[in-house]
UniProtKB/Swiss-Prot annotation:
It comes from the Eukaryota. GO terms for cellular component: membrane. Keywords: Membrane, Transmembrane, Transmembrane helix. Its main location: membrane. This is Putative uncharacterized protein YMR193C-A. It is a multi-pass membrane protein. The chain crosses the membrane at residues 45-65, 95-115. It is found in: Membrane. Partially overlaps RPL36A.
């Protein structure tokens, strides 16, 4: 059961990854649907913080041109987290310059999380 949940979560986020990479022309309904999908992961009882880190943080900041973080965060939290449109904000340039580092960190966190989850699953299955 654990592996099925983990796989379904990862598969869903991989689909989101493909949407961001290969379909840069999301229409409004697709954007709203994607926001609601992310919101479901935040509100659901089972999710991996590493997947949230890897997909939500990295991809929403890497693709701000078509997928507005301002509009999505408004739908998720009821208020904007950060207006990416403000190009004069020093936080924007600071964050953008550290994206490669953040990407590496997020993938390391993801790998560690997957490793420990696999270990826990193996131990759980072997004892039951």
């Amino acid at each position: 059961m654990f592996h099925l949940k983990a796989f379904s979560q990862y598969y869903s986020f991989c689909k989101m990854d493909l949407i961001f990479k290969h379909n840069s022309f999301l229409d409004r309904s697709e954007e709203i649907s994607l926001c609601m999908h992310i919101k479901w992961y935040f509100s659901s009882g089972y999710f991996h913080w590493s997947l949230i880190t890897q997909n939500y943080i990295i991809f929403l900041f890497l693709f701000p041109f078509k997928f507005s973080m301002h509009s999505c965060s408004s739908r998720i939290w009821g208020k904007p987290l950060y207006k990416f449109e403000n190009r004069h904000n020093p936080f924007s340039s600071l964050f953008m310059s550290h994206i490669p580092v953040l990407t590496v960190i997020s993938y390391c966190v993801c790998c560690l999380s997957c490793f420990f989850d696999t270990c826990k699953s193996v131990l759980y299955c072997s004892t039951s």
